[in-house]
């Protein structure tokens, strides 16, 4: 008989060990340091636009673009925080409201959050949207003030329509005392193509582009945070250069670099290692990449999942080392659709979905010539097969495909 382990003192034992971290939170994306390195130009540009709020005027609306981890959110929050501090010192009323549109992704939720920020009692569901908008306008127009609304990941919001942006962009015509300005932050340079031309014109009065960091700049950022995050002597000599090099390969993503530095330390600490070494960084890189792939695959549409599963089946059924052609992939895809009773898309549309997987870094597709047989695309996987397969089969619509590889598939390729 197995004796159950006592849980007495479980956390006390873990807390007894000395942590290699001084303050892990400074390595998280939510932390904004007092000094933002290598972003003076962007800070000054945004401050120049927003300074009119301190004169009681309406600042221009701003669109901020740049790839992930280029400091867009950090700069916007940093400048917003400073604006509020100066306005308070000068006894002015200036509010900066930050909204993450990946979380608050509907018109109703956005307006309800704005109204609640100004202490209006609005339920998170149930009211007509017009009523919520009216409550928000009444709340802010009670006094002379300037309000800056930061819409981070604004492209996530417009996927469900741009009505709310249209209404917010025209709100100043309905206000007597308050003035409202918007800052939209996005990783996607093309998202405005889907906007109503009137919204696009109003929202993009000013535009700021954030370039990627280079390896040296990322290294500076990591050194700054490492001093605050880790105890002295904990980091091995190659840890920061390696984190910076990995992140520079990922289009200069400082967020990725900070994640690497944090996860490397977590791996070392869980193994009771006194130092964070190069091997911990390499393992952290692998873990983060798997986590990224899992998240991307999990959120794919069903048809894209079927395309990906077709490629996985072909790669794992005696075709290791051989690339998959679009024709082979489409044949298997059709069988999968039949098997779970899903509509079959045209080969052209399926090829488009495969190209989207290529853009996401999940597969690698290369056009090759077959001589007189024409050209085709050869597809290889850029992600771990088993991890990806498990994530795909978590989808209840794909669960019936668990046994497909030993039934229909064997018949097709026997």
Swiss-Prot record:
Keywords: ATP-binding, DNA replication, Nucleotide-binding. Belongs to the CDC6/cdc18 family. It comes from Methanosarcina acetivorans (strain ATCC 35395 / DSM 2834 / JCM 12185 / C2A). GO terms for molecular function: ATP binding; ATP hydrolysis activity. This is ORC1-type DNA replication protein 1. Pfam families: AAA_22 (PF13401), Cdc6_C (PF09079), Cdc6_lid (PF22703). ATP binds at residues 70-74, 213, 225. It comes from the Archaea. One of its GO terms (biological process) is DNA replication. Transmembrane segments: none annotated. Involved in regulation of DNA replication.
């Amino acid at each position: 008989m197995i004796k159950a382990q006592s849980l007495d003192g479980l956390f006390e034992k873990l807390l007894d060990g000395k942590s290699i971290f001084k303050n892990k939170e400074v390595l998280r994306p939510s932390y904004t340091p007092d000094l933002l390195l290598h972003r003076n130009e962007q800070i000054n540009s945004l401050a120049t636009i927003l300074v009119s709020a301190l004169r009681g005027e309406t600042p221009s609306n701003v669109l901020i673009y740049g790839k992930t981890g280029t400091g867009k959110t950090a700069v916007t929050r940093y400048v917003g925080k400073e604006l509020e501090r100066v306005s308070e010192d000068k006894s002015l009323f200036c509010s900066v409201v930050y909204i993450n549109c990946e979380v608050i992704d509907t018109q109703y939720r956005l307006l309800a959050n704005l109204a609640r920020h100004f202490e209006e009692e609005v339920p998170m569901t149930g009211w007509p949207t017009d009523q919520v908008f009216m409550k928000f306008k009444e709340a802010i127009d009670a006094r002379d003030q300037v309000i800056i609304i930061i819409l981070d990941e604004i492209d996530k919001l417009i996927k469900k329509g741009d009505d709310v942006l249209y209404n917010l962009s025209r709100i100043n015509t309905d206000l007597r005392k308050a003035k409202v300005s918007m800052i939209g932050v996005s990783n996607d340079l093309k998202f405005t193509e889907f906007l109503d031309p009137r919204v696009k014109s109003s929202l993009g009065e000013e535009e700021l582009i954030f370039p990627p960091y280079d390896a040296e700049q990322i290294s500076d950022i990591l050194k700054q945070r490492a001093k605050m995050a880790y105890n002295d002597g904990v980091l091995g000599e190659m840890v920061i250069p390696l984190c910076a090099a990995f992140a520079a390969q990922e289009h200069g993503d400082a967020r990725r670099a900070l994640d690497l530095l944090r996860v490397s330390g977590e791996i070392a600490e869980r193994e009771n290692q006194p130092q964070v070494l190069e091997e911990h960084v390499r393992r952290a890189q692998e873990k983060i990449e798997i986590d990224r792939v899992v998240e991307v695959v999990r959120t794919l549409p069903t048809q894209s999942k079927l395309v990906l599963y077709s490629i996985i089946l072909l790669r794992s059924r005696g075709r290791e080392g051989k690339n998959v052609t679009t024709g082979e992939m489409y044949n298997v895809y059709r069988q999968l659709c039949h098997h779970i009773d899903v509509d079959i898309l045209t080969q052209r549309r399926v090829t488009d979905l495969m190209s989207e997987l290529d853009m996401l870094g999940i597969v690698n597709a290369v056009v090759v010539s077959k001589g007189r047989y024409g050209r085709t695309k050869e597809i290889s996987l850029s992600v771990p097969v088993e991890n990806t397969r498990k994530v795909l089969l978590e989808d209840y619509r794909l669960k019936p495909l668990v046994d497909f590889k030993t039934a229909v598939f064997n018949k097709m390729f026997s």
